[in-house]
């Protein structure tokens, strides 16, 4: 789980959970993470109802810090926000300052994000249903852009081992096409000097490094440079498989 540092620190949350009969321990390489000692229905806990934490895989918790949020960051656009796990993490890193625009194609997911944001006390999040006209107006406006791209989900086989049998070549071809289209389109939202993070919960190079390389070789990516990338393998970390790449727009 990820501690909501807008409301509480990790030590205090661990103490409150213990008082509710839930034992946990900190993860040393994840500053806002607690791991449960054993499975528990923590969604019924008072700490959850009070918005003191969110359930989020440890690998997923690496994405927001990877974006290098500092005092100069005033606007972040989370382009594929879904129900907002990473959006809420970004809100804590901004300390409820600045503006986070959370976008998605599904209104239902954005409504869930709004509910979670209220529970978390995150007030710097604005949700937007993706609209081509709005996207054009937002070009060049963001200090940071997060693309948590739709993917095969092969990094989460640890939790969903049946997923690999559902993957067909046609699906992979389609998802890779979508990923590149998203990179081409949403990279335009970034300011000169801004940074974009492309992330997936897949470990397939064709969804990850190869997508970034294709983008950098394209007209849309000619002013971008790869700053850093990281692959997290589930068998090494014990958590979900993940990929992250950080690009800077040298415009």
Where are these regions (language model features)?
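S-adenosylmethionine
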Residues: 1-251
């Amino acid at each position: 789980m990820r501690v909501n540092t807008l409301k509480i620190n990790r030590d205090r949350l661990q103490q409150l959970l213990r008082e509710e009969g839930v034992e946990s321990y900190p993860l040393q390489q994840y500053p806002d993470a607690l791991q449960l000692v054993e499975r528990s229905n923590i969604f019924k806990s008072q700490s959850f109802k009070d918005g003191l934490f969110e359930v989020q895989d440890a690998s997923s918790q690496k994405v927001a810090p990877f974006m290098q949020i500092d005092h100069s960051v005033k606007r972040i656009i989370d382009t594929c926000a879904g129900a907002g796990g990473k959006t809420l993490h970004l809100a804590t890193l901004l300390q409820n300052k600045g503006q986070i625009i959370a976008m998605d194609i599904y209104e239902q997911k954005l409504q869930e994000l709004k509910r979670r944001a209220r529970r978390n006390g995150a007030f710097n999040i604005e949700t937007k249903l993706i609209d081509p006209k709005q996207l054009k107006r937002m070009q060049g406006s963001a200090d940071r852009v997060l693309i948590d791209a739709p993917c095969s989900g092969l990094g989460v086989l640890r939790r969903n081992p049946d997923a690999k049998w559902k993957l067909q070549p046609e699906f992979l071809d389609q998802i890779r096409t979508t990923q590149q289209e998203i990179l081409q389109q949403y990279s335009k939202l970034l300011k000169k000097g801004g940074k974009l993070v492309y992330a997936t919960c897949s470990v397939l190079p064709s969804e990850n490094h190869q997508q970034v390389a294709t983008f950098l070789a394209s007209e849309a990516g000619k002013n971008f440079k790869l700053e850093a990338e990281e692959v997290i393998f589930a068998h090494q970390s014990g958590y979900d498989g993940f990929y992250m790449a950080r690009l800077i727009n040298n415009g």
